[in-house]
């Protein structure tokens, strides 16, 4: 073989070897960053770990935030079970701001922005955890384990979560996470969602890597078997258990009404629940679900559908108890306040594509292989009174976690690799 050609083949061989080694490293890193699915409730927390022992707190001045005659004291011990694709990042921002404003103690994951999801939550996964440690707010993604979470917060902590119409949630999850669910790679048509829903059993394998993202994701996030037989009595038992564990279940479709109920429950002020939509997709990235596809998606996610129906009914009972007219007044007040903040804070008054975001600190996390998540540009001239609040309201989840002191070395390393490879 001529010498130049031999050198070219040697160079190609070295490139292939280096490429194989680098790919292996990425797979190893990803397997560490996204742990395998555990179906049991085995905990990594040592047996007999001491429960939370909160220190006595100085009594606070009562507030009349909710219009009650005697006033009430704001609640500061909160567990937010952060479900996927439910506007939960917007709720997270609300909790981050409240905790930061009042100097509260967050239970953060150690190394990444979730608690080793999809593994079950365990106390030992909390950054700087020590037996007996007590936290005010737990709010990052996890697979819920009530007993483990309960051991980290005060006995009177408020538990909340948020649900979404299961068909809409499935569509969002399918497009956001589909690239990391290998069995979807077999889908070849232009409309992969429609192709999948034509015959989901042909593609779906409950044992497949990241399969949980594409069936009954709410049920899974809440700690239950997402492939449970719909006729099993356990389904209703699990739904009733959720009702016992959570003081309020919010609904994404009625987000403003949900925040009014949350404000009332927690005895917070209106400013505490102001928000901008975070982690939202651009309109062109949201396909329409036709009537037939909607029906198929609902049937495929039947456990989530039963869960949602149950809490949709209980939600409106809470609204009735709150008072329809009072609810309408408070929703209107919230929307006026949000609109005022939009005019004060947001350059151009609306969300923009990732490419149009000028400050890297405002860049939201994007799904693998896409730039579909919108973000914001902060106005350059904001009065001193609102400057801090505006920035906090617009800061994406990952950046806000780092601002609050969370150790995200795995997340940051993964982002560096994605940026380097332009994924």
Curated annotation (Swiss-Prot):
The keyword Lyase does not apply. The chain crosses the membrane at residues 15-35. Glycans are attached at residues 66, 156, 312. Its main location: Golgi. One of its GO terms (cellular component) is Golgi membrane. It comes from the Eukaryota. Belongs to the galactose-3-O-sulfotransferase family. This is Galactosylceramide sulfotransferase. The lineage of its organism: Eukaryota, Metazoa, Chordata, Craniata, Vertebrata.
């Amino acid at each position: 073989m001529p010498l130049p050609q031999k050198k070219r083949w040697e160079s190609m061989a070295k490139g292939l070897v280096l490429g194989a080694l680098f790919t292996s490293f990425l797979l190893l890193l990803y397997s560490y960053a996204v742990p395998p699915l555990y179906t049991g409730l085995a905990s990594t927390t040592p047996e007999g770990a001491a429960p939370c022992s909160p220190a006595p707190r100085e009594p606070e001045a009562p507030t009349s935030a909710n219009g009650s005659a005697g006033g009430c004291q704001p609640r500061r011990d909160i567990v937010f079970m952060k479900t996927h694709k439910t506007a939960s990042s917007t709720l997270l921002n609300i909790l981050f701001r409240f905790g930061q404003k009042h100097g509260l103690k967050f239970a953060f994951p150690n190394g990444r922005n979730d608690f080793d999801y999809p593994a079950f939550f365990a106390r030992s996964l909390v950054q700087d955890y020590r037996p007996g440690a007590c936290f005010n707010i737990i709010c990052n993604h996890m697979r819920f384990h009530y007993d483990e979470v309960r051991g980290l917060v005060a006995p009177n902590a408020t538990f909340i979560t948020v649900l979404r119409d299961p068909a809409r949630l499935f569509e969002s999850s399918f497009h956001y996470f589909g690239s990391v669910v290998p069995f979807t790679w077999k889908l070849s048509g232009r409309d992969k969602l429609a192709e999948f829903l034509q015959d989901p059993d042909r593609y779906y394998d409950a044992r497949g890597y990241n399969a949980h993202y594409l069936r009954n994701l709410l049920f899974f996030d809440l700690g239950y078997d997402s492939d449970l037989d719909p006729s099993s009595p356990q389904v209703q038992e699990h739904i009733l258990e959720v009702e016992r564990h959570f003081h309020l279940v919010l609904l994404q479709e009625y987000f403003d009404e949900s925040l009014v109920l949350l404000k009332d429950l927690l005895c917070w002020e209106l400013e505490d629940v102001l928000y901008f939509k975070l982690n939202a997709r651009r309109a062109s990235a949201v396909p329409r679900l036709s009537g037939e596809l909607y029906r198929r998606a609902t049937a495929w996610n039947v456990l989530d559908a039963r869960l949602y129906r149950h809490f949709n009914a209980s939600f409106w009972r809470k609204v009735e108890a709150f008072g329809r007219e009072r609810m309408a007044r408070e929703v209107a007040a919230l929307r006026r306040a949000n609109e005022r903040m939009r005019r004060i804070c947001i350059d151009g008054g609306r969300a923009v594509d990732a490419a149009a975001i000028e400050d890297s600190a405002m860049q939201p996390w994007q799904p693998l292989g896409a730039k579909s998540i919108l973000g914001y540009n902060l106005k350059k001239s904001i009065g001193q009174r609102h400057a801090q609040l505006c920035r906090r309201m617009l800061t994406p989840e990952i950046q806000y976690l780092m601002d609050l002191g969370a150790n995200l070395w795995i997340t940051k390393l993964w982002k560096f690799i994605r940026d380097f490879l332009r994924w």
